[in-house]
């Protein structure tokens, strides 16, 4: 699970203000015939993992269960000994979602 769907000061500094993985999704281009890019989320649901409490987590968990997925592997970012992009996971764990 990639938790980079919200802004953090480090990404603003390194990649430009407002950068998230949605920035990369939006600028994707096809590389070969039949390569469908960019792949936009249904109903333009460019969610922010910090904006809606754990509503996005709950929606994704329910969708995963519906298709027989019962766990997530969550990527952790460490830069120079500092944990980054941790807030969505911390919010999730506090809420027992």
Name these PLM-found stretches:
Residues 1-97:
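Glycan-processing catalytic domains of CAZymes
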């Amino acid at each position: 699970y990639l938790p980079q769907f919200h802004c953090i000061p480090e990404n603003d500094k390194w990649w430009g203000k407002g950068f998230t993985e949605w920035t990369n999704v939006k600028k994707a281009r096809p590389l070969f015939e039949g390569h469908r890019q960019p792949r936009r989320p249904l109903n333009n649901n460019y969610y922010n993992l910090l904006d809606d409490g754990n509503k996005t987590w709950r929606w994704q968990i329910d969708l995963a269960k519906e298709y027989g997925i019962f766990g997530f592997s969550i990527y952790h970012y460490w830069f120079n000994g500092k944990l980054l992009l941790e807030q969505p996971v911390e919010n999730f764990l506090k809420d027992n979602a």
